């Protein structure tokens, strides 16, 4: 599952990225490990004030049931204070690992 993450207007990007890495990432990592997810990748924009999206998050599961269990298990951690949920794009897709491992 891939998320193009849109920040709320007038967000402090340094504080947002700090929260994302220090609070949200450990929460997602713990939940991924609990439900059998096998990869989690976060990319932050190098120029978020000029980009449409502040970052990208990729969560990898062996099958769709992992995503279902993740959604049922993840605990709120304040990320909603930073993210424009209506502007975020979510792609639930089948992944093929190709290229450089």
Question: Residues of each region from the PLM?
Answer:
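Macromolecular interaction modules
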Residues: 1-101
């Amino acid at each position: 599952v891939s998320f193009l993450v849109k920040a709320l207007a007038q967000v402090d990007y340094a504080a947002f990225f700090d929260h994302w890495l220090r609070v949200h990432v450990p929460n997602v990592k713990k939940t991924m490990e609990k439900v059998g997810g096998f990869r989690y990748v976060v990319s932050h924009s190098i120029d978020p004030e000029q980009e449409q999206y502040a970052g990208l998050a990729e969560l990898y599961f062996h099958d769709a049931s992992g995503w279902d269990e993740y959604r049922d298990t993840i605990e709120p951690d304040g990320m909603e204070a930073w993210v424009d949920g209506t502007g975020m794009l979510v792609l639930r897709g089948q992944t093929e690992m190709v290229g450089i491992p």
